[in-house]
Regions:
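Solvent-exposed serine/threonine-rich low-complexity stretches and specific carbohydrate-binding patches
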Residues: 282-292
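Short loop/turn segments at secondary-structure transitions that flank enzyme active sites
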Residues: 2-3, 202, 276, 323
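Predominantly extracellular/luminal regions of secreted and cell-surface proteins
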Residues: 185-218
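Short secondary-structure boundary/capping segments
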Residues: 9-16, 267, 286-287, 298
Length: 346
């Protein structure tokens, strides 16, 4: 690849050595490279590689081609495992001079773990990596998360690392989308944890669980990351607030991954009811980012409305699917997907 990837210097070195002499010992090559490339921190990088390989070997985890760190959060990328890997990199950093090339190389190699941990924060299910805290009754973002996100952005910038993947999704867009997600995370969402009922059927992703829409975990930039998917059909879902409640604003996010036929909906309609039978429209939000050949490959859009003097128990969201990929798309006429996450009601 022309773009940086995890430990790409090491992998290039090992492949080149083995091409010249296939009889060389694989583990010896790894140790030799790490000791020279990372200085006194090299042994901790070697230990990291050994530990993560061991964890993968000990599970039935299947690594998808277009996978996401969230798929490994119950196995080799569990919160405790990620914490252990992070500590090894921090030990490596502590063993070399701050101004040395060794330090810069270790920081650069560490961003894969930083990325996985940032995605773990989104899930908001681990005490080791909490997304938010309450401070003096005010909901705030975990300061450690903010520091890690800033460091991730800085290291990528300093090393001219511009892409998150081979599909053209940029680091700049990733950080921007993440910051937008943090803005959502600190909202006082009265729909959080409330029961969601689906009137159309989802498919395959997020275990087809409607509660994904109100579970407090934020969808990332991959459709494997906490998004509820609908293939070729609209999304119709309603949430029960348990009692008549005053509401002032509503929003929900949708994902776009154009090369995988995942598009934003045509529009999103919000409705309210007191009895689940008679629904009144609160408003319809049109897609501001119409699909075209120059659309971002990977993007997240928030559909939101503000309302006044509305008291209700049930809130419904209807998202209109494009149904099929357009004629100019490589998947022309195939069913298109919409992916939704986190209904926010304030």
């Amino acid at each position: 690849s022309r773009n940086d990837s995890e430990l790409f210097e090491l992998r290039s070195y090992v492949m080149a050595k083995l091409l010249w002499d296939p009889s060389l010992n694989f583990n010896t090559l790894i140790k030799d490279f790490n000791d020279k490339y990372y200085g006194d921190g090299g042994k901790y990088i070697t230990e990291y590689i050994s530990k993560i390989q061991s964890q993968i070997d000990n599970t039935s985890f299947f690594l998808f081609l277009y996978g996401d760190p969230s798929q490994g959060f119950d196995s080799f990328l569990s919160p405790q495992n990620l914490s252990n890997y992070d500590k090894l990199f921090n030990k490596a950093l502590s063993k070399v001079d701050y101004n040395s090339n060794y330090f810069k190389r270790i920081l650069r190699s560490k961003i894969s773990i930083d990325y996985a941990i940032l995605e773990l924060y989104r899930k908001n299910f681990s005490d080791l990596y909490k997304l938010t805290f309450y401070e003096n009754s005010l909901k705030i973002i975990n300061p450690e998360l903010t520091e890690r996100l800033n460091n991730f952005s800085d290291v990528c910038s300093e090393n001219n690392i511009t892409y998150m993947n081979e599909m053209g999704f940029t680091v700049t867009d990733y950080v921007s989308n993440y910051q937008n997600a943090l803005t959502i995370a600190i909202k006082n969402n009265i729909a959080s944890g409330k029961k969601v009922t689906l009137e159309t059927l989802p498919k395959k992703y997020a275990n087809e669980d409607p509660q994904v829409l109100t579970d407090g975990a934020l969808g990332g930039n991959s459709f494997y990351s906490n998004w509820l998917g609908f293939e070729g059909n609209n999304m119709e879902a309603y949430v029960d607030l348990n009692e008549i409640t005053e509401i002032n604003s509503l929003s929900i996010n949708f994902l776009q991954v154009t090369n995988h036929i995942v598009f934003f909906p045509k529009n999103v309609e919000f409705l309210q009811s007191d009895d689940k039978s008679n629904w009144t429209t609160l408003g319809t939000v049109e897609n501001n980012l119409k699909l075209n050949p120059r659309s971002k490959v990977n993007d997240i859009q928030t559909f939101s409305i503000d309302v006044e003097n509305i008291k209700t128990r049930y809130v419904k969201v209807v998202a209109k699917n494009l149904s099929k990929a357009p004629i100019w798309h490589h998947g022309a006429d195939l069913p298109s997907w919409i992916f939704a996450d986190e209904l926010i009601i304030e």
